UniProtKB/Swiss-Prot annotation:
The keyword Phosphoprotein applies. Interacts (via cytoplasmic domain) with SARM1. Forms a complex with SDCBP and PDCD6IP. Residues 90-102 have a biased composition (Polar residues). It comes from Rattus norvegicus (Rat). The lineage of its organism: Eukaryota, Metazoa, Chordata, Craniata, Vertebrata. Glycans are attached at residues 41, 55, 57. This is Syndecan-2. Residues 42-69, 88-129, 178-201 are annotated as: Disordered.
Amino acid sequence: MQRAWILLTLGLMACVSAETRAELTSDKDMYLDSSSIEEASGLYPIDDDDYSSASGSGAYEDKGSPDLTTSQLIPRISLTSAAPEVETMTLKTQSITPTQTESPEETDKKEFEISEAEEKQDPAVKSTDVYTEKHSDNLFKRTEVLAAVIAGGVIGFLFAIFLILLLVYRMRKKDEGSYDLGERKPSSAAYQKAPTKEFYA
């Protein structure tokens, strides 16, 4: 019984020490260049210079072409649910105009103004990403792990109580002398001595 308590104590100490070690580590330990996730190698800033630069004189542009419009259905996703469900659909029209010769700064300003106007109109539509719950790095801060540990502890505690009660019951029975099951030991006369003649070939 003492061994069981020692093992239980050692197990709890190992869990607590693992929890403190997990809290001490940070995300900077995972990268070689000792910088945060945002500054880690492999993540480069977005270069928008190539988007607006083009070659050609632009003499062959068709200025009389009509504006093309496309419609796109964007689902509204509730951010509170764990599973994405499409509630309503909104119709968003986007006009595509032929390319015009403007400076990149003017084009960027217009796009920025359009995106701000869209955000003011309907902020719920601005993100179509599926909402996912971020799991914490520490194992014991997750609710499912914590529930499993508590359930395991309760079951182990009940099993320990059962073993203690069984031990007490057997000790009381032993004191009463009820372990005599009625089997008699055979007497020494029941065993006959075999002849000790040895034959040599």
